[in-house]
Amino acid sequence: MMYEKRSYTGYGHPSSHYDYPPPSGPPGSFYLADVPPQHFYQWRSPPGIVRILQGSVVILCLVIFACVASTLAWEYYGSGGLLGYGGGLGSYYNGYYGGYNGYYYGGLTNPRAANGFMIAMAVLCFLVTLGLVIAGLSKASGARSRRFYLLVAVLSGLLAFVMLIASIVYVVGVNPRAGLGASSGSLYYNQMLMLCNQMMSPVAGGIMNQYLYHYCMVDPQEAVAIVCGFLTVILLCVICYFAQKTRHKIWKYGKPNIFWDKPLATAEGPNVEEWVKNVSGDVGTQDETATLAYSEKPISPLTSAFLPAQENGYGHSTPSSPSVPPPEGPSPPEEKDKGSVSRPPARRGHRQRPRPTGLEESQYETDYTTAAESSGEQNRDDWASLYPPIISDAIRQTYKAEFNNDLQRYKALCAEMDDIGTQLRQLSHELDCLPEGSLRYQGVAEEYNRLKDLKRSPEYQSKKLETQSLRDKLCHIKRMVGGYDQSRS
């Protein structure tokens, strides 16, 4: 057989190749404190910081280009005007001009070459960084891999190196005092130093003074270009750091635990920590509306017809005792789910069906506890006989300890069934995107049907009813503790 079935964990495609061991749970799971989800769509995340810094580098490159280009007129036209005007000043200044001309094209830094090199490197940095920004903002899978951010780090390091060289060359080219220091004591140095010292003298006329001022002093736009050049070097080095940090997070947490796009907002149940805090408090008014189940999912309109109406926040349904045997058959929603989803892999082809809403999807995939299936009137009476109202602090501590133990068991069951529901949703999405008849499609469909069979198994149904029973028990104990605390206050 051409298709080799791989072990599937539900967090990626069964035929995908992992560069790292897959994590042990779905992204954003409440129970995986050691594997927190990474929200890479946020601007304060490492890839978000990389994009911000790259945008800053693009702006700095534009500023460098504008500032350097604004001084080119002095280099290409000011020199000719100065030498032509100085020809009539006599042999004294002609000697200096000859020395200046020898310096200008001699072994020292040529300001024209420095300007051209700075502009060329700024344009190169602008184009490369802009290309990386556009690629990083795209939703292509290649732009969300460790290999891409390795490319970002390498290119940013190379750009930082060439921009550092260009900035140093530009500083030496536009600041003759920095360049002349290397030739201290030479004839060229003495001649140019004398010209720069007489920069403010009105003897040579206005044209010579203006050009000498430009040559001997650093213009404001040249200073801005120098500062922007070194800032660009620093930002490129920081980009290298955050690109490597992004690669490390992808390797450490795994691609399934990374959100590149903002997840759709879905209705969530109450916070378990707040619930436990309210119960654990010594004094406080307990709100019975806060006794909803931790993993309770909203009811979709399609399945509400199977469920009785609710009254005072508790649904009337078949009561569950502390120990409930496994049911002989699936519940009505399960029967509907069974008839419509579990089918041969070949018949679940690529179809453009509308994606279910968060409410409807969660109802079908994690329907082990719903408000309409638990906390019936008779069930509350059963728990009231087992856990009567609290009359002393000792009984309250006993209730509280039992509440904490049952809560841990309840959370573990919810996590286990949430995991199955998450895998089914991911597999359903993959089946909608794959072409029917492909080997990859067959493998995903087999895993999908296996999980659906698991949901209909007696073991799963037993856990489902145990979760419902634990929820009713926790709600009752919470009311007893809340009533006792309220009576004392």
Curated annotation (Swiss-Prot):
Modification(s) after translation: Dephosphorylated by PTPRJ.
Entry-linked PANTHER family: OCCLUDIN (PTHR23288:SF6), OCCLUDIN AND RNA POLYMERASE II ELONGATION FACTOR ELL (PTHR23288)
Residue ranges constituting the MARVEL domain according to the UniProt record: 45-248
Cytoplasmic side: 1-51, 138-147, 245-489
Top-level taxon of the source organism: Eukaryota
GO MF annotation list: cis-regulatory region sequence-specific DNA binding
Name under which the protein is recorded: Occludin
Residues the record lists as Phosphothreonine modifications: T285, T369, T370
Composition bias type Pro residues, residue spans: 322-332
Tissue expression: Localized at tight junctions of both epithelial and endothelial cells.
Cysteines paired by S-S bonds: C196-C216
Classification lineage: Eukaryota, Metazoa, Chordata, Craniata, Vertebrata
